[in-house]
Amino acid sequence: MQILTLISWDFKRNNNFFNQAVLNPYEYWADILEKNGISRYVILLTCNRVEIYLRAGFPEDLEAMKPNVLHDEEAIKHLMEVSSGLDSMSLGENEILKQVKEAYELSVRNGKVDKVLSLIFQKAIFVGKKVRSETEISRGKVSVPSIVYDILSSRVVQKVLIIGNGMIAGEIAPYLSGKFEVTIAGRNIDHVKDLASKYNYSYTTINDLHELIMRNDAIISATSSKTPIIRREEMVEGKLYIDLGNPRNIEDKPGADIITIDDIYSVSNRNGSARMESVDEARRIIEIEMASLMNKIKDVMIDEIFADFYKFAVVVQKMEIEKFSRMHPEIPASDVEAFAHSMINKVMNIPVMTLKSVARSQSNQDFSRIFSKFYDNFSDLVSAALQSYEGRQDTQSLRDRTRRLLQRS
């Protein structure tokens, strides 16, 4: 029996199809699932991944996009690694845990989760929090923008000048929003205006660079220039200079407070090494929580199938009560019903508890295989039992008869 299927595209694998998949909004994926009769799912969409978690079925429409496909334990383990930050571009990032939580909550609001799917995602969110609180996986910044932000925050800095409007400048700009007064400067006023307008920053050209340096506390140079942008004679004492260029954008000057891209990388590598040391510890936490979760899933699946069996027992109970009441009209029907109900509960309690105990001693694969066979044949077994019980030998569909009897109950 299928517990969970993951269909995914991400930045690590199948890049060609990922570039296509990541452009599609939530509604696109939900529409495909619904058209394929799939109603229990969670869709996780980020800049680096498209992941669709299903309880049952498989949308054949997506096969042409060559997705990664994982089933059951592998799919659940992957989700826990994602929520823990082990599968992120930046190891241990915090944002992904929030994104997993939001994806799950959206499916809850839309009525797209069942008990098993809820168990899986609630556990994954719990594991993500536990890994971060009990390991160093998220401690210490590793990205250039976050390290630059920490450096600025540790100094007496209010006004920041960013020189450049390329990729690095674009990555740093959002980190400073709301914290510093930022001006973006470059050679092309239209280009810097486009970047500055996203965050309501000031913008200008670098025609009078010395004056710009005078007006700001920290100067970040992030251009691809092959020659220095800031020369010694333009530098002002008491300013913080952060040079993210390669080659260098800022000339050396004795006594100047200059932090280079090599200094940034040194911090990143040091913090990254500390995070890597936490990976094994994080995986141990995932392994322990996986075992706990799988036992809960087994319990839920057993409860669900015995709930169907209980419905069958109620059908039989009603028939027997009717017969007994005709034979003994002097006994109140309510007393007979109470007695029968109590007997069913007591009789069923032992096999349910026993099966749960046995299930926990079986490997997850063995349990899934055995349970699938039992579940797939259950309706036929109940139908045959009903036919035998009623003593009827007609051509009516056993499955239809069972369904009607269960509805009557």
UniProtKB/Swiss-Prot annotation:
The record marks H78 as: Important for activity. It is an enzyme of class 1 (oxidoreductase). Substrate binds at T46, C47, N48, R49, S88, E93, N94, E95, Q99. GO terms for biological process: protoporphyrinogen IX biosynthetic process from glutamate. Pathway: Porphyrin-containing compound metabolism; protoporphyrin-IX biosynthesis; 5-aminolevulinate from L-glutamyl-tRNA(Glu): step 1/2. InterPro entries: 4pyrrol_synth_GluRdtase, 4pyrrol_synth_GluRdtase_dimer, 4pyrrol_synth_GluRdtase_N, GluRdtase_CS, GluRdtase_dimer_dom_sf, GluRdtase_N_sf, NAD(P)-bd_dom_sf, Shikm_DH/Glu-tRNA_Rdtase. GO terms for molecular function: glutamyl-tRNA reductase activity; NADP binding. The keyword Transferase does not apply. Pfam families: GlutR_dimer, GlutR_N, Shikimate_DH. The active site is at C47. It comes from the Archaea. It catalyses: (S)-4-amino-5-oxopentanoate + tRNA(Glu) + NADP(+) = L-glutamyl-tRNA(Glu) + NADPH + H(+). The keyword Oxidoreductase applies. NADP(+) binds at G164, N165, G166, M167, I168, A169. Possesses an unusual extended V-shaped dimeric structure with each monomer consisting of three distinct domains arranged along a curved 'spinal' alpha-helix. The N-terminal catalytic domain specifically recognizes the glutamate moiety of the substrate. The second domain is the NADPH-binding domain, and the third C-terminal domain is responsible for dimerization. Catalyzes the NADPH-dependent reduction of glutamyl-tRNA(Glu) to glutamate 1-semialdehyde (GSA). During catalysis, the active site Cys acts as a nucleophile attacking the alpha-carbonyl group of tRNA-bound glutamate with the formation of a thioester intermediate between enzyme and glutamate, and the concomitant release of tRNA(Glu). The thioester intermediate is finally reduced by direct hydride transfer from NADPH, to form the product GSA. This is Glutamyl-tRNA reductase. It comes from Thermoplasma acidophilum (strain ATCC 25905 / DSM 1728 / JCM 9062 / NBRC 15155 / AMRC-C165). The lineage of its organism: Archaea, Methanobacteriati, Thermoplasmatota, Thermoplasmata, Thermoplasmatales.
